[in-house]
Amino acid sequence: MEWTRNRYRISDDKSELDLFWVVPAIQDSYWASGRSRAVIEQSIANSLTLGLYADGRQIGFARAVTDKCTFAWVCDVMVHQDYRHIGLGKWLMDCLGEHPDMADVAEQFLRTRDAHGLYEQYGYRVCDAMVRNREQA
């Protein structure tokens, strides 16, 4: 799928992803600091991904792990700092929600330390949860 707005475009085509942008962007995030390139590439291969592009250059990314009906975990939502605060993060979340793999998912989860206001606009709320963390190779 593809969405276009002026000079910006969002696509779910994994072959368009610029891994030379996506991998370091994820590795530089507070939630995935130090994550290996191999793990990031495997997570992309096994997820629904959206790339956000300005004039053909990657400036954003989001992914979701989902069974397409009951559960989805939204993660790695990011927009390059030079393109923030102009509505592109909202548009990325809109497109993710409209995607056929996500449109009918009953429960969608995410974990964040920031941007609570953005996610609350999409119906996300703080809830109790349990988590199991294991070291990755």
Model-derived segments and their meaning:
Residues 1-35:
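Short amphipathic alpha-helix that is part of the acyltransferase structural core
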Residues 17, 69, 114-117:
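Short alpha-helical
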Residues 38-55, 59-78:
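A conserved beta-strand-loop-helix scaffold within acyl/acetyltransferase catalytic domains
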